[in-house]
Design a protein with these regions (language model features):
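Short, small-residue-rich loop/turn micro-motifs
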Residues: 83, 108-110, 213-215
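Conserved alpha-helical substructure of the radical SAM core
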Residues: 121-150
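Conserved AdoMet/S-adenosylmethionine-binding subsite of the radical SAM
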Residues: 141-150, 155-234
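Canonical Radical SAM [4Fe-4S] cluster-binding loop centered on the CxxxCxxC motif
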Residues: 95-132
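Short linear Ser/Thr-Pro motifs
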Residues: 72, 105-106, 119, 189, ...
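Flexible, acidic/Gly-rich N-terminal and inter-domain linker regions that tether
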Residues: 1-100
Length: 234
C-alpha cells in the first residue's frame, strides 16, 4: 500500500479526488499527521468512518521504530531508525541556542564515494521516499517532545541525487499545514551535482544550499571527491 506521508498537500488533494473524495480532506489529514502527530487513521475523528476505512484499505502511515539512540555530553543525539523494509538510516539531533536542528538522511547508502565521508562505507541500496525523509523529523519530535526548528539534508546519501523526493519532502516540511518549518531553516548540502543545483535554484523555495568543496583546486578535490571529475571547480 502507499505511504500517505509520501504526498505533498497538492498531490494528496489530487489523490483523494481520484478515489471519489473531496480535495479539502487533504488539509484535514495533513493537520492530523503533521500537527496532531497521530499514528493511525482511526484517530482522525473529524473524518467519516467510511473515509477512514477507505484510507486504511489503500494507504499506510509510515511510523519508524528507533533501533538505537546515542547521546553525547553536549546533548547531541544520534538515531538509528528501522525504515520497515529491513534497512536502517541515521539522523542526528543537535541543540543550539536558537533551537533544535536535525540532520536527515536522503538515501540508504550513497553513490558519491567521497573519501572523507562515513557514508562512503555504506553501499547504495535505494533512495528514500519523501515520507521516509519527513518521518525522521516526526520520529525525533515524538521521542524528545520538542519542536525541531531547523532541518539539514546532510545525513546519509546525496540529496540532489534523490531530487524529486527531497523536493517533495521540503514542500511538506515547509507547508504551514504540514510540519511548518520556514524555508530559510531548511538547508540542502550537496557534493556538487551542478544540473540539480540549477534545478533547485529555479524552484520557488527559499531554502539554503551548501556545496561541499573540501579543496581549493581540482586536482586535490578530484582525489577526494569523484564527482569533481564530472563537475569541477572551474
Amino acid at each position: 500500500m502507499k505511504n500517505i506521508k509520501d504526498y505533498d498537500l497538492q498531490d494528496l488533494k489530487d489523490e483523494l479526488v481520484s478515489i471519489g473524495e473531496k480535495g479539502f480532506r487533504a488539509e484535514q489529514i495533513f493537520k492530523w499527521i503533521y500537527q496532531e502527530k497521530v499514528k493511525s487513521f482511526d484517530e482522525m475523528t473529524n473524518l467519516s468512518l467510511e473515509l477512514r476505512e477507505k484510507l486504511k484499505q489503500n494507504y499506510t502511515i509510515c511510523n519508524y521504530n528507533i533501533l538505537k539512540k546515542l547521546e553525547s555530553s553536549d546533548g547531541t543525539r544520534k538515531y538509528l531508525f528501522d525504515i520497515l523494509d529491513g534497512n536502517a538510516i541515521e539522523s542526528v539531533l543537535m541543540e543550539y541556542h536558537y533551537g533544535k536542528s536535525i540532520c536527515v538522511s536522503s538515501q540508504v547508502g550513497c553513490k558519491m564515494g567521497c573519501k572523507f565521508c562515513a557514508s562512503t562505507g555504506i553501499p547504495f541500496i535505494r533512495s528514500l521516499s519523501a515520507g521516509e525523509i519527513v518521518e525522521q523529523i516526526l520520529a525525533v519530535e515524538q521521542d524528545t517532545g520538542d519542536k525541531i526548528s531547523n532541518v539539514v539534508f546532510m545525513g546519509i546519501g546525496e540529496p540532489l541525487d534523490n531530487y524529486d523526493n527531497v523536493l517533495k519532502a521540503i514542500r511538506i516540511l515547509n507547508n504551514p499545514q504540514g510540519v511548518n518549518i520556514g524555508a530559510r531553516h531548511i538547508s540542502v548540502s550537496t557534493s556538487g551535482l551542478v544540473p540539480r543545483i540549477y534545478d533547485l535554484a529555479n524552484e520557488n523555495i527559499q531554502c539554503t544550499l551548501s556545496v561541499s568543496l573540501h579543496a581549493s583546486n581540482d586536482e586535490k578535490r578530484s582525489s577526494m571527491m569523484p564527482v569533481n571529475n564530472s563537475y569541477n571547480i572551474e
